[in-house]
Amino acid sequence: MKSYRKELWFNVPGRRAFINITPRVQECLRESGIENGLALVNAMHITASVFINDDERGLHQDYEDWLEELAPHEPISHYRHNRTGEDNGDAHLKRQVMGREVVVAITDGRLDFGPWEQIFYGEFDGGRRKRVLVKIIGE
């Protein structure tokens, strides 16, 4: 069995963003030479997420609206976490809802997606470098 590991780095200038990282994960798969196995893609920060969904602008805005309704950024004083001097209590909750990682089957050298599925990096507290781990195992 072969194993491949790579870190993808992001530095989102704004507070939040959804970035389609499917092409970068596909490039990792090509580099790995693995034809059949599993790809784990996970955010290595507690205010960022990796998830699978459709790459449709309206859906991204729906996520933004829904997450802000669930855990609004302001008032910052609303979050106990922010009493430590932070201002990102909402980002931790948003990440928890959106998830940490995805696992995608690899079949015949391709990510084995359903219709419309794409891999996204979700940033909820931007402004600094963060990384996503891609770990691929298989034959």
Where do the model's predicted regions map?
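Active-site histidine-anchored catalytic micro-motif
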Residues: 1-139
